[in-house]
Curated annotation (Swiss-Prot):
Cofactor: Mg(2+); Mn(2+)
Gene Ontology annotations of biological process type: 'de novo' UMP biosynthetic process; glutamine metabolic process; L-arginine biosynthetic process
Residues binding Mg(2+) 1, per UniProt: Q282, E296
Region (Allosteric domain): 931-1051
Annotated stretches, region: Carbamoyl phosphate synthetic domain: 549-930
Segments crossing the lipid bilayer: none
Species per Swiss-Prot/TrEMBL record: Saccharolobus islandicus (strain M.16.4 / Kamchatka #3) (Sulfolobus islandicus)
Catalytic reaction equation(s): hydrogencarbonate + L-glutamine + 2 ATP + H2O = carbamoyl phosphate + L-glutamate + 2 ADP + phosphate + 2 H(+)
Full protein name: Carbamoyl phosphate synthase large chain
Gene name for this UniProt entry: carB
Family matches, as HAMAP family: CPSase_L_chain_A
Length: 1051
């Protein structure tokens, strides 16, 4: 019999960070839906302003607060929930739940943990307890010993025997974990590993070099009934974090005995921790025989469970929430099939491939090798009916400029077999591209296996693609059968045209004449054995007929955001879902095209039709041919939609909203600059230089500093502010190729200016706009900036000029829908630096801060016009809202933390307050590892920029109760100094509570910044922000903890 609590508190995961991303927006949203179906009142604590779940329709009450125990206690004290769910917000939520239990908060207020209980969570997440639990239940684990100190770790490593894997307890994304081949390796890194554990514990485990890694997803109810939902095979062997691995489902290389044995072990692991809900179990399999070890389990929804849910069509999060309420598996209906109960295990008649997406080129000094710590910022998932088709589709989905496994930049690069094998041995990201290159250059299967440990089954498949492509290259024409085979192997029109040295139009014409078109197949969880009631689909060339009939009428295709990367994250999924809901009022049918397994937009019950497939011109045209969509919307999914808008329009596609030609003007720097001049709108001086002489001439005219934007990057550092000739020419020489083909854009950098933005909607005549002001000065990328609504330091005169500029642009470009304009304001004069004719990164924040959904307003603007009389309208603010960036420095091994014009943050948090400082502090505290410093601790404050702000920061921190040191090489007037070596020692000894610094000082303070982030010490990288946060510390006791609507926010 199920229990029905009246009110349930759901804990979210906070801002997006590496290893804890949008999968928890998906899982949390599903949990809230499952609770609402039962008539249970829901309360959500989550500071992630960009997510779908922090919209009002999901939870009855929403608290945008730091996801930490003391803030959640305030909510419990006020709301008095009967139950709490901690399994849908990642490791962050589990840690909060354990803390609330240990501190007696749950017991004090009579709050029951729903789902897996705290003792089960501790058994799973403490490496020592997990090992003991497995041994007690006769389940196989690798030889290992736990440790809580450096000395104990070194001693136990000798007992276990090198090489060893160091695993970290109560940890996210493998932070601090490593493979130590020698005692020297271990001594060098063990302190960092212990620092990254929530409970200060690590496991020293025998390293299983080149063993196969596998994952099983299992559901279990309170009666012990279990269903194994998916088996996921990692192509990367042990030693590479599962979040860094390319994976396939279902498993491709297991025989039945291996599969069944591990399936049985999975159910036993779930039983041993008394799981109620869902968990994933990770295994190591010896490729040379029937030998397996259990590695770990996660007793919560995870990245893998989100993937399994999207791969199988089984709604894991929804079912898990129902089980947490006391339902049994046979009582829950699978809403994808609409017929089967949740105890039916999925059966797949297709192959799913997931590939992570990295953005390591944005970070200086970062270690490029894939290892035990997760560094990828997103992932893509493809579906095909052969491994080759699925893999090639996934490669294109990465949006890294590769047309597939073969035929791209790496495949055609000047690279020898030896070089390709070297990159493979180093475990570079996107290894499959180097595997193909190695085969092209003559490597054997055995040679590639030796350096990678990747199963020969998969290597043979990739070699087959290389052989086929090389055969294509010697053809003068392509016959129908060869073209069919190419498409079945996942080759795009672009790849085929490159091989034949023809145009893509030529290949498409032959396809059309021969009727070689993909078919639409349904994902129904049971391989077509039962009819599906949801339209969850993919396209494949390995089939003969469509699984459904296509309706007629007024239909819209929406382009999603694709795989997340730095700059494109969950905020664009919020825009896609918002547009989907708004568009349903204007269209008979709305379909979504997207391929991100983490998101709400790719969930089974969000869209009327979901195409889980590629986002490119070829695929959109295929879908239009089948579905006869009247419009395509490209503006809600970030840059990926804008990048194909013009070509779609050229192919006769009608775009919803602003025209492709207007988008092209906004995206093209020269065209946009001429437009601004025509309208009399100020912009920073700039030049597109094709030689060093042109650069020198421009710099002599405008002076330093200047902002450099190369069009062709060699070193991975795309933009830089140069303060001197030496700095500028050294950067241009080192970082970029300069020529008429690859011009470098140099613009005047306006110092000590305020950066501001307008998020808005236009109907071509009027504008609805929201002004956002940055705390940091101009020069810090808007994605890394702290933002305030309403504005604080801008004058009314400046804001009025900004509004006039925005209105002029909206009318001139006939903007229909959402847009974002970025300004630099100096001496009350706004200068436009950028216009984006699409939904923006900040739009969920500005919408929720003002209580008005800009995407909903966009649809009104497009079809009915904006419904107010003013030319320009900005809704009033009732209270304060502040958005803060979330950085993932600790995950990015070796990189130097600093802020500049290149975006580095992975997510964002926001909070509301009765004052600016109330909102700012809660927002800042929502990003890990930020926390209130312990009084009587030490702060380091130093830098070479914003010196007045740094000095005032130091004064505030002294008032707060800290001992503040500056560094003797960079002294601050009136602040005690210590030398750099002493500062490094204090950080390494974990005696420093907070570091506040400013400027690019890599040669001077690399060790201070890097050690601080490695040891989870809060670091503020801007003097102005440091000043505002230090001032907020002084009012810490005045923080407010209201529900979002009490601040006048929320949508």
């Amino acid at each position: 019999m199920k229990e029905t609590p009246k009110k349930v508190l759901v804990i979210g995961s906070g801002p997006i960070k590496i290893a804890e991303a949008a999968e928890f927006d998906y899982s949390g949203s599903q949990a809230l839906k499952a609770l609402k179906e039962e008539g249970i009142e829901t309360v959500l604590v989550n500071s992630n302003v960009a997510t779908v779940q922090t919209s009002k329709k999901f939870a009855d009450k929403l608290y945008m607060l730091p996801v930490v125990w003391w803030a959640v206690e305030k909510v419990i004290e006020k709301e008095r929930p009967d139950g709490i769910m901690i399994g849908f917000g990642g490791q962050t939520a589990l840690n909060v739940g354990v803390d609330l239990h240990k501190k007696g908060v749950l017991q004090k207020y009579g709050v029951k943990v729903l789902g897996t209980q705290i003792d089960g969570i501790e058994k799973a997440l403490s490496r020592e307890k997990f090992r003991e639990t497995m041994i007690e239940n006769n389940l196989p684990v690798p030889p290992s010993l736990s440790a809580r100190s450096e000395e104990e770790a070194i001693k136990n490593a000798k007992i276990v025997g090198y090489p060893v894997m160091v695993r970290v307890s109560f940890n996210l994304g493998g932070r601090g974990s490593m493979v130590a081949w020698t005692e020297e390796d271990l001594k060098k890194n063990i302190r960092r590993a212990l620092s990254q554990s929530y409970i200060g514990e690590v496991l020293i485990e025998k390293y299983l070099y080149h063993w196969i890694e596998l994952e099983y997803e299992v559901m279990r109810d309170k009666k012990g009934n279990s269903a194994v939902i998916a088996c996921i095979e990692n192509l990367d062997p042990m030693g590479v974090h599962t979040g860094e691995s390319t994976v396939v489902a279902p498993c491709q290389t297991l025989d039945n005995l291996e599969y069944q044995n591990m399936r049985t072990y999975t159910i036993e692991v779930a039983r041993s921790i008394n799981l109620i809900g869902e968990c994933n179990v990770q295994f190591a399999l010896n490729p040379r025989g029937y030998e397996y070890y259990i590695i770990e389990t996660n007793p919560r929804m995870s990245r893998s469970s989100a993937l399994a849910s999207k791969a199988t069509g089984y709604p894991l999060a929804y079912v898990s929430a129902k089980l947490a309420l006391g339902y049994e598996l046979h009582e829950v209906i699978n809403k994808v099939s609409g017929r089967t109960c949740a105890c039916f295990e999925p059966s797949l008649d297709y192959i799913v491939t997931k590939i992570p997406r990295w953005d390591l080129s944005k970070f200086e000094n970062v270690d490029q090798s894939l290892a035990t710590e997760m560094m990828s910022v997103g992932e893509v998932m493809s579906i095909g009916r052969s491994f080759e088709e699925s893999l090639q589709k996934a490669v294109r989905m990465l949006d890294i400029g590769e047309p597939g496994v073969v035929g791209g930049k790496i495949y055609e690069a000047k690279m020898s077999k030896v070089e390709a094998l070297k990159y493979l041995k180093e475990r570079r990201p996107y290894w499959f591209l180097y595997v193909a290159k190695a085969f092209k250059e003559g490597a054997t299967i055995d040679e590639v296996y030796e350096v990678t440990g990747i199963s020969k089954f998969f290597l043979n498949k990739i070699k087959g693609l290389v052989d086929f492509y090389e055969t294509l290259k010697i053809l003068k024409e392509i016959d129908e059968e060869t073209l069919k085979l190419a498409k079945k192997l996942g080759f795009s029109d672009e790849q085929i045209s490159k091989a034949l040295n023809k145009s893509t139009e030529y290949v498409r014409k032959i396809r059309d004449q021969s009727n070689i078109i993909p078919v639409v197949k349904l994902i129904d969880t049971l391989a077509g054995e039962w009819p599906s009631v949801t339209n969850y689909m993919y396209l494949t060339y390995n089939g003969t007929e469509d699984d459904l009939e296509f309706s007629q009428g007024n239909k819209l295709l929406m382009v999603g955001a694709g795989g997340f990367r730095i700059g494109v994250s969950v905020e664009f999924d919020w825009s896609v879902v918002s547009l989907m809901e708004a568009a349903s009022k204007y269209f008979d049918e709305v379909a979504v095209l997207n391929y991100n397994p983490e998101t709400v937009s790719t969930d089974w019950d969000i869209a009327r039709k979901l195409y889980f497939d590629e986002i490119n011109v070829e695929r959109v045209l295929d879908l239009i041919k089948k579905e006869k969509f009247r419009y395509v919307a490209t503006f809600s999914g970030g840059q990926i939609g804008n990048s194909i808008a013009k070509e779609l329009e050229e192919n006769g596609v009608r775009l919803l909203g602003t025209s492709g030609s207007s988008v092209d003007i906004a995206e093209n720097r020269e065209k946009f600059s001429k437009l601004l001049d025509k309208l009399g709108i100020s912009q920073p001086n700039w030049v597109s230089a094709t030689s060093l002489e042109e650069i020198k001439k421009f710099v002599n005219e405008v002076g330093f500093p200047v902002l450099v934007r190369p069009s062709y990057v060699l070193s991975g550092s795309s933009m830089k502010i140069a303060y001197s000739e030496e700095e500028l020419y050294e950067y241009v020489r080192r970082a970029t190729e300069i020529s008429p083909k690859y011009p470098v854009v140099i613009s005047k950098y306006i110092e000590n200016a305020i950066e501001a933005e307008v998020d808005g909607v236009s109907d071509g005549n009027r504008v609805l706009g929201i002004t956002l002001e940055h705390v940091e000065e101009a020069g810090v990328h808007s994605g890394d900036a702290t933002m305030s609504i309403p504005f604080r330091k801008l004058s009314e005169n400046s804001v009025n000029k900004m509004r006039e500029n925005v209105l002029s642009l909206a009318r001139e470009l006939n903007i229909k829908g959402p847009f974002n304009v970025q300004f630099v304001v100096k001496d009350n004069t706004p200068h436009i630096i950028e216009l984006n004719l699409r939904a923006s990164r900040s739009m969920p924040f500005s919408s929720k801060a003002k209580g008005i959904n800009l995407i909903n307003e966009s649809m009104k603007a497009i079809f009915n016009g904006l419904d107010f009389s003013e030319d320009y309208y900005e809704p009033p603010s009732k209270y304060w809202a502040v958005k803060s960036p979330q950085f993932s420095w600790s995950q990015l091994r070796g990189t130097y933390p600093f802020l500049g014009p290149e975006m580095k943050s992975t997510g964002e948090a926001a909070s509301f307050g009765v004052t600016f400082y109330d909102a700012l502090l809660k927002s800042w505290l929502s990003s890990i590892p930020n926390r209130i410093p312990n009084k009587n601790g030490i702060a380091l404050v130093y830098g070479d920029k914003n010196l007045d702000y740094l000095k005032d920061t130091a004064v505030n921190l002294v008032k707060f109760g800290l001992t503040v040191y500056s560094i003797s090489e960079l002294p601050l007037q009136g602040i005690e100094t210590i030398d750099k070596t002493k500062a490094e020692e204090l950080v390494r000894a974990k005696k420093v509570e907070i570091v506040v610094t400013d400027g690019y000082l890599k040669k001077f303070d690399y060790n201070i910044r890097r050690t601080a982030v490695d040891y989870n010490i809060p670091v503020i990288l801007n003097g102005r922000l440091g000043y505002e946060v230090s001032k907020a510390f002084l009012d810490y006791d005045s923080l407010t903890f209201f529900e979002i609507s009490e601040y006048g926010g929320g949508i």
